[in-house]
Amino acid sequence: MQRGLLCCALLLVAAVARGECECLWQGDFSEVQASTSLVLSGTVLRRKGNSIDLSVDRLLRGQEHLDTIRVWLKAADYCRPEPELFPVDSQWVMALHEIEKDVPGGFNPHTPNVSYGRVGDYSLSSCGGYWLKRSGEWVTGNLVQAPRWVREPKMTPVVLDLVTDYVNGKVDKGALLQASREDPALRELMLDTRAFLRGDEEPASP
């Protein structure tokens, strides 16, 4: 009896293990974004199976001619985040890999909405800081020098324009780090003062 229970337990553990992703942490957003095909800011329009349709609100790097792209997420043992993390209408900055070829077993006709993904679509890795949460013009997440595997580290929101400048090589990592550690009240005062003196429209602090 005990031997039978032990065998069942071992089989269950093996089954779970086969469905788990195994990968090393590849780095925060500032470290991993350069190795991806496309970096953009977008809004989730719909979710279907293990994919989301994302509106292309702003391209930070790369080329994409469609207004809406499909991003494939967790299924089987693929090292990707769970679709439930990205509800409809939520806003994100994502560093994405283009799916360039089919993989064996990547498509099951019995579950067409759950698959590896289609050639020409994109996938989002969970092995680093490949996505940042966006609220208006401000982003948070594993952006720069954040603890491994922590998706919502304690930080000051960083303006999207600065992240865009970093992705395009106009500022260095130090600028991101400084912005993520600024005192929010002091920064808001500086923004208000700058807007008053120059008459420019500055993004409202979150």
Predicted regions and their residues:
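OB-fold (S1/OB) nucleic-acid-binding surfaces
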Residues: 50-73
